[in-house]
Each structure stands twice: as structure tokens, then as C-alpha cells.
Amino acid sequence: AFAIVLDKPPHLAVHPTLNYPLDTLANGYAARMEARGESPVFRPVNRIDKDTSGLVLAAKNGYAAPLLARNVEKLYYAVVEGELPLGKGVIDAPIGRQAESIIGRCVTPDGKPSRTEYTIIRAEHGLSLAACVPVTGRTHQIRVHFASIGHPLAGDDLYGGHRDRIARQALHCARQSFRVPTYTEVPGGIRLETPVEEHAHTVAVESPLPEDMRALLDAEI
């Protein structure tokens, strides 16, 4: 196997930090792989914030990691404040660091090109459910983009959302799909390649909406 998909709960950091040195997805992965007699090296293809829930794709070797990174497609569900028109939309706005902030990002003319495509599925009682495809992968992209149009994610107090109805940003990575790398034996090892689309075996993994986001929608929509 070249990859594994993990379903991360909210409030769990992906990597160890000064504030969260032990209880992380990376440490849990390493312990599980060691128990199975496999390499404990954690190679996440995508990363999600500590309070974001959902799928994290990890490569099981260093050869597969860049191939998977180039062809993975992700779908997120976000509950945003305010009622947006039903249907499809695009937020295409550059994102950069907030001045004098280590964590915060913002839409700024000198930021990196950033594009989020979304579909508003439901909108009622002051909330909207959006299915989001981050075409680019900037830090906090979905959070920053919706905040920039006046509709921050519910619970996202870093970008103007309110925590009276949910205790974290209402964002969940619900689906990932990727083409499985092919390999060819060569002298001294193997060569991994991303197959052309018409010959590819595509894997799609889905994660249901977590309980706190379901409760938010059930209560308000």
C-alpha cells in the first residue's frame, strides 16, 4: 500500500507543537504503524487545522508523497454565518499573512493567488451549508475567503465567527479522491508514476459530517 487515509476528530493537532507535544495525529499514527511493524514516519499529503475535522491523506513512503500531492482532490463542508444564495459561487482572492500575526491570514493584494469554488446547499435561520473545493491550498483558505465576503465560518472566532452555537470552526474535510500511483520494477528498486487519467485507478474516501456540525445544522436549519 502506498497511502493511508485518516479521519481526524476536531480539537486534535496534526503535528506536535509546544502546546500539544503528545496528543497528536502524527504521534498516534507512529504508534499504530510501529505496532503493525511498519514505518512510523508520518508523511501527510494534506494538513488540516487542529479544530478542523475530517480526512488527512498520508503517504506510506517518500516516493508516493509527491505523486499523491499532485493529484489529490478535496471536498470540505463548511457552515458559514449568514444566508448566501443557493447554488454555485467562486471566491478568487489572494491570501497573505496578517500584519504582526503569526497565525492569522487575510485577503491582500500582495498575497498568493487563491481560489475556492463552492456550492451553497442550504441556507436558513442565519446559517448556510457550503460544499467547498479549495482549488489552491493556502493556509486557512476557506476560512479566510468566506470571512472576506462577510460570512465567516460559525465558531471561527479568529476570523470573526461566533462560538455561541459551536465550539470550533464549522469545517470538515468530507471527501478525498486520488489516482493510485503505478510502479515499475527497475534495477535497485521501483519507479512510481502517476498514471494518466484514462488508465488510472481512482480511490475516493468519504467521512460523514461530525456530530457537532450535525447538531448545529439540526438546531438551526
Predicted regions and their residues:
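Short Pro/Gly-enriched beta-strand edge/turn motifs at strand-loop
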Residues: 99-102, 113, 156-162
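Short histidine-centered loop motifs in beta-beta connectors
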Residues: 125-126, 130-133
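Conserved hydrophobic positions within beta-strands
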Residues: 80, 117-120, 153
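RNA pseudouridine synthases
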Residues: 1-99, 170, 200, 206-220
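Non-catalytic RNA-recognition surface used by pseudouridine synthases
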Residues: 90, 99-100, 109-121
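Short Gly/Pro-enriched turn/cap motifs at secondary-structure boundaries
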Residues: 46-47, 107-110, 165-168
